[in-house]
């Protein structure tokens, strides 16, 4: 799955140069429960000083932030009222990716963060495209991400003519 350029960070830790590849989802879940030293050892395979461990954890955080902030990997979102459910899903995204990609949930945990985000985005879009309500939801999700108004659509909606200045300096409305 090489559709997205993946950030790799080069570091010198413990006197050695290493390149951190994008972390797997399983490692990210484990990292949340570990000390910086344990997490750094998980990602590098080396026992490191406290400073180097923090450096590695910061680098991993940068890779995750890069993957999450990429516009091409953004999962569509549109707020909607839903019945309040007293439980929280912890692996809903992983289950969605597993069903979409024909993988098992454990296989999903072995994906790196970039591949996971790409598949999650595609799974959400694919699932929403299946119904009229979902297609409307996708259009609304797209609409709220736009930062520049579509002036032609606004003019049409409010029946406003476009002002055009000709070469001779006269103004006309079209």
Question: Model-predicted segments: where are they?
Answer:
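Long, compositionally biased
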Residues: 126-156
């Amino acid at each position: 799955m090489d559709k997205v350029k993946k950030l790799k960070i080069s570091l010198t830790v413990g006197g050695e140069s290493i390149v951190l590849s994008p972390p797997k989802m399983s490692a990210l879940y484990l990292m949340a429960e570990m000390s910086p030293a344990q997490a750094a050892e998980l990602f590098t395979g080396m026992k490191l000083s406290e400073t180097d461990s923090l450096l590695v954890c910061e680098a991993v955080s940068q890779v995750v932030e890069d993957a999450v902030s990429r516009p091409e990997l953004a999962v569509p979102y549109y707020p909607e009222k839903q019945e309040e459910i007293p439980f929280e899903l912890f692996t809903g995204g992983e289950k969605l990716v597993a069903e979409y990609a024909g993988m098992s949930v454990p296989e999903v945990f072995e994906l790196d963060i970039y591949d996971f985000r790409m598949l999650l985005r595609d799974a959400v879009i694919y699932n929403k495209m299946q119904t009229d309500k979902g297609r409307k939801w996708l259009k609304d999700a797209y609409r709220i991400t736009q930062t520049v108004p579509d002036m032609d659509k606004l003019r049409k909606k409010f029946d406003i003519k476009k002002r055009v200045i000709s070469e001779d300096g006269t103004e006309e409305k079209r």
